[in-house]
Each structure stands twice: as structure tokens, then as C-alpha cells.
Amino acid sequence: MNVIIDYKVGNLHNLKNALDFSSVENQLVSTADDVRKADRILLPGVGAFSPAMEQLKNSGMLDALQEKVQTGTPLLGICVGAQLLMDESEEDGTHAGLGWIPGKVMRFQHQLKIPQMGWNQVSQQKADPLFQEVADEMHFYFVHSYYLLPQNSEHVLGLSSYGYDFASVVRKDNLWGVQFHP
């Protein structure tokens, strides 16, 4: 079962509606027991990093998510959900993330208009099952003021450009993160 983590942060219903429309079996979950039954996990998120991390910690699902990640269950973080996978974020001070993908979440340079809002291309850097049936340079919708900066360039699957190139798709083992809204 594909589960969408409901930790009261994110546009869960748009994601669920998109999966339903595509006939992809899915379920919104908000308990550790339901997380433990997952075959694949979607971790959405919108808003600020620190409150999202606090909500995830307070949800009671963090230990179950950690167990699933350690046993190889595929997990896709979306927008702030992708940012939470990193070690830390500099949004409103320095805040610890999940630390599942080494790296930081950085603010776009001040001379850029933020948030970046609109359609942007993703340039695929290497082949990956995530890109199956997705054309290189395809446009996706972005709304963000911070970007992923993985410590290891091997974790970068896709780049986008907004003033400069930034990682818009990352992967480490069974973890994927996308900065855009699919």
C-alpha cells in the first residue's frame, strides 16, 4: 500500500486526488501502526521547515518511519517533505532535520525574488526509476524559498535553475526527494 503521511502539514488532499485520478492505490495515514503496514511512503509538506519537523515529531509516527526507512521501504519526500530528509535547514535559524540524506537546506540568494513560484524545468542528471516515463527537461511546479544542497553530488538526480543551478531531485538508497509539487 502507498501511504501518504498525514502529520497536519501539507496539501495532502491534492496529492491523494492526483493518485486517485491515476488509479494508484493509496491511503492517508496518521498512526505508527498504519506506517508500519506501508509498502511505499509519501511524505508531503508545505510551509516552514521547523514547524513541519515539530509536527512530524509530535505525530507519533517518527519511530515507525525510521524503522521503515532502515528496512528499505521506498519513501518520497515532496517539497518541505524532501527538505526534512536532509541533516539541517537554515530557515529561521539552524534546525535539525531527519538526517537521512546528508546535506543542508539553504535559502536562495537575497537578490533573487522569493519564493520561486511557477513552472521550472528539471534536468535529469542520471537514470533512475523515478524518471520512468518522465521526459528530461520536463516542467514541474515550484513554490519555495529554500533549496536542497546534498553533501554528496552522487545524491543529485535532477537539477533546476533559479539564478543558479540547484538540486531539485535527490536520492539516497530507498529515499527520494523532490522540491517541486508533482
Language model features: what each stretch is:
Residues 42-44:
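Structural motif
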Residues 2-24, 180:
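N-terminal beta1-alpha1 ligand-phosphate binding loop
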Residues 70, 104-182:
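Amide-donor transfer/coupling interface in amidating biosynthetic enzymes
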Residues 47-118:
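Cysteine-nucleophile active-site neighborhood
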Residues 34-35, 68:
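Structural alpha-helical scaffold elements that stabilize or flank donor/cofactor-binding regions
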Residues 38:
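An anion/phosphate-binding loop that grips the pyrophosphate of nucleotide cofactors and donors
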